[in-house]
UniProtKB/Swiss-Prot annotation:
Gene Ontology molecular function terms on file: anthranilate phosphoribosyltransferase activity; magnesium ion binding
Native source species: Methanococcus maripaludis (strain C5 / ATCC BAA-1333)
Subunit structure: Homodimer.
Protein family according to the UniProt entry: Belongs to the anthranilate phosphoribosyltransferase family.
GO biological process: L-tryptophan biosynthetic process
Gene Ontology CC terms, in alphabetical order: cytosol
Annotated protein name in UniProt: Anthranilate phosphoribosyltransferase
Family matches, as NCBIfam families: trpD
Binding site for Mg(2+) 1: S84, E217
Entry EC no(s): 2.4.2.18
CC cofactor: Mg(2+)
Binding residues annotated for Mg(2+) 2, in chain numbering: D216, E217
Length: 321
């Protein structure tokens, strides 16, 4: 199949599923060759779906009921606060959240890095994860603990330090099989492709695939693209005005500790550029989870949760599990 990829031929869903399983027994050099060849060719929806299905089938299983995930592909190279972690804690005030995350590959603050910087412990086992969910409505599922089959592939990804299909796969491979998902992607064309792949992997009720002018989040300073899936596909664009918010700057973030501090500032009621960034994405997550009727409603729900102290209280609950 490597020659096929080098010739820029696309793989079918079945071939992609088989290739994933084959990579688990390949040398690091050949794994790197396959990943680079796929990335250079450009991954298709069938290839994403085949890899994602195989990754889920190889994962450690965990049943947490009907949950939501807030996750981004990463790989956008940005230096921003970890918005998806902030959003997941806000969302946990209203519904069950199983956040699937990892350490940083291409950014300054991956979700696992920031989660620990917030003073939270990553559950060691599925039993610990279930305990966290039962007590707090929230659990952080550290990708490396649920995908042991990938231990040969992770060092290759770390060494390559470039975007690969695995940047796309992480959010599609949550072992809790979320019914609702807001998923940030690192390029505009991935919105439709990843939405299609998510629908093909199965189990999803509603999802929003978002890309924000260079970010795998909705951007507070420009136009964002969304592909919405709820049994059918709909693609459209939004700006902060659609959320009742003013445009605001994105302030660079240099470390997980800085990201954690700035999230706590917002949770404590500080009104700044980070707040708009978080509110916009939280509103979209609340809409995806069918808690908010639309984006404007989502902003009001998120604001109330912050201003009433619910979000800080939720963070404290999660810290104390």
């Amino acid at each position: 199949m490597l020659n096929k990829l080098i010739e820029r031929e696309n793989l079918s869903f079945k071939e992609s599923y088989e290739l994933f399983n084959m990579l688990l027994n390949e040398s690091e050099m050949r794994i790197a060759a396959y990943l680079v060849a796929l990335q250079t060719k450009g991954v298709t929806a069938d290839e994403i779906a085949g890899f994602a299905k195989a990754m889920r089938d190889n994962a450690v299983k965990i049943d947490l009921g009907e949950v939501t995930d807030t996750c981004g592909t990463g790989g956008d190279g940005s230096k921003t606060i970890n918005v998806s972690t902030a959003v997941s804690i806000i969302l946990a005030c209203f519904t069950k959240v199983a956040k699937h995350g990892n350490v940083s590959i291409t950014s300054n603050s991956g979700s696992a890095n920031v989660y620990e910087a917030l003073g939270c412990k990553i559950p060691e086992t599925p039993e610990d994860a279930k305990k966290s969910m039962d007590k707090t409505n929230f659990v952080f599922l550290f990708a490396q603990k649920y995908h042991p089959a990938l231990k040969k592939i992770m060092p290759v990804r770390n060494e390559l330090k470039v975007k690969t299909i695995f940047n796309i796969l992480g959010p599609l491979a949550n072992p809790a099989n979320p019914k609702y998902q807001i998923l940030g992607v690192n390029s505009a064309e991935l919105c439709e492709n990843v939405a299609f792949a998510l629908s093909k992997v199965g189990g999803i009720k509603k999802a929003l695939l978002v890309y924000g002018n260079g970010l795998d989040e909705l951007t507070p300073n420009g136009t964002s693209k969304i592909t919405e899936y709820d049994g059918k596909f709909d693609t459209y664009e939004v700006t902060p005005k659609d959320f009742g918010l003013d445009y605001s700057k994105i302030i660079p973030c240099e470390s997980p500790d800085e990201s954690a501090k700035r999230l706590i500032d917002v949770f404590s009621g500080k009104i700044n550029e980070d707040r708009n960034f978080i509110l916009m994405n939280a509103a979209a997550a609340l809409y995806t989870s069918e808690i908010a009727s639309d984006f404007l409603d989502g902003v009001e729900i998120a604001k109330e949760a912050i201003e009433s102290g619910k979000v800080l209280k939720k963070l404290e609950e999660i810290r104390n599990v």
